[in-house]
């Protein structure tokens, strides 16, 4: 395992200096699952949720969150995002969320992709909690990333 880049020689946290890194195209894809009762899944499918369409609200919230990641996560660089897409798909267990975030920058967008699906999942919870207090947000993870010094990453199927 390599050295942590956010820790300086004195052992305190710091924002990584990316000044000397080249600008490259970066992409990150993250996902999460929102587990809910079959009755709640049916309500989402049939547009019978009290606060409106949770899938559309989640997509918008995820896009907005990706753009504000540097304000939420300490030491993240503010990045000029070139694209953010959040998809919400109804499954038999609940909702599968996936975000894709890209930029041309000196550092990656993994945190932006993870933040997008995290906030999208929280939004679905908020929009459906009146119907189901037992909703679970699970399997938040990076699926793949491209670009940058550390190379590409692709999660292997389980």
Language model regions located:
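C-terminal binding/interaction regions
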Residues: 1-55, 60-77, 81-158
């Amino acid at each position: 395992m390599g050295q942590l880049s956010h820790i300086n020689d004195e052992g305190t946290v710091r924002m990584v200096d990316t000044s000397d890194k080249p600008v490259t195209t970066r992409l990150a894809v993250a996902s999460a699952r929102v587990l809910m009762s079959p009755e709640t899944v049916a309500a989402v499918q049939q547009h019978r949720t009290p606060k409106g369409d949770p899938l559309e609200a989640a997509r918008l919230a995820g896009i907005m969150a990706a753009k504000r990641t540097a304000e939420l996560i300490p030491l993240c660089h503010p990045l000029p995002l070139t694209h953010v897409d959040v998809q919400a798909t109804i499954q038999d267990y609940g909702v599968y969320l996936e975000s894709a975030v890209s930029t041309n920058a000196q550092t990656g967008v993994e945190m932006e992709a993870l933040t997008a699906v995290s906030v999208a999942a929280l939004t679905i919870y908020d929009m459906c909690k009146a119907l189901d207090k037992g909703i679970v947000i699970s399997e938040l993870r990076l699926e793949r990333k491209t670009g940058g010094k550390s190379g590409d990453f692709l999660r292997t199927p389980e």
